[in-house]
């Protein structure tokens, strides 16, 4: 590892330990030339797939886009920022676990809707209305009827 002070390429590891969250290894190093100490962090590289859009374009997976969409759907609902982050983290983890190089937006959208449905039904309907691009009120009503059927027709 190159010393940030003198540029020498050789060092020794003085101390090595996991970070609190277990997501990285912190290493204290000492340069063999100038003997100054510096810290490095080693972490697993997140390898997220390319997202294949409906029109066939490909772009890098962007967590921020999912956060924005979910947060918009959850506006003025009793859903905390922590719950939004947890939902998006779960979707991101699911995408990583698939191990695919490419993933369709439909897979991501369905994963988000599945989790939103259990988190907040109003947010789910809001997200679904944008994601599924309902063409008219009839399609919207069909989605609501399906939601009511799956909930056993309970009134809230």
From Swiss-Prot:
Manner of cofactor binding, per the entry note: Binds 1 zinc ion.
Alphabetized GO MF terms: ATP binding; DNA binding; zinc ion binding
Keyword Lipoprotein: no
Domain ATP-cone: 49-139
Zinc fingers classed as unnamed: ranges: 3-34
Repressor found in the keyword field: yes
Keywords attached to this entry: ATP-binding, DNA-binding, Metal-binding, Nucleotide-binding, Repressor, Transcription, Transcription regulation, Zinc, Zinc-finger
GO annotation terms (biological process): negative regulation of DNA-templated transcription
Recorded superkingdom: Bacteria
Cofactor: Zn(2+)
NCBIfam families attached to this UniProt entry: transcriptional regulator NrdR
Entry similarity comment: Belongs to the NrdR family.
PANTHER family assigned to the protein according to its UniProt record, in alphabetical order: TRANSCRIPTIONAL REPRESSOR NRDR
HAMAP family: NrdR (MF_00440)
Biological role stated in the UniProt entry: Negatively regulates transcription of bacterial ribonucleotide reductase nrd genes and operons by binding to NrdR-boxes.
Protein name: Transcriptional repressor NrdR
Source species of the chain: Anaeromyxobacter dehalogenans (strain 2CP-C)
Lineage per the UniProt record: Bacteria, Pseudomonadati, Myxococcota, Myxococcia, Myxococcales
Gene: nrdR
């Amino acid at each position: 590892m190159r010393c940030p002070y003198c540029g020498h390429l050789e060092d020794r590891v003085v101390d090595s330990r996991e970070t609190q969250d277990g997501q990285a290894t912190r290493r204290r190093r000492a340069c063999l030339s100038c003997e100054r100490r510096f810290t490095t962090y080693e972490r697993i590289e997140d390898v997220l797939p390319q997202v294949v859009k409906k029109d066939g374009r490909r772009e890098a997976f962007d967590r921020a886009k999912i956060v924005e969409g979910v947060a918009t759907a959850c506006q003025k609902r009793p859903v905390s920022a922590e719950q939004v982050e947890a939902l998006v983290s779960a979707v991101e983890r699911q995408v990583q676990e698939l191990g695919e190089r490419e993933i369709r937006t439909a897979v991501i959208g369905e994963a988000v809707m599945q989790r939103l449905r259990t988190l907040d039904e109003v947010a789910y309907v809001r997200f679904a209305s944008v994601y599924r691009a309902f063409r008219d009120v009839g399609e919207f009503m069909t989605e609501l009827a399906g939601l009511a059927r799956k909930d056993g027709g309970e009134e809230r």
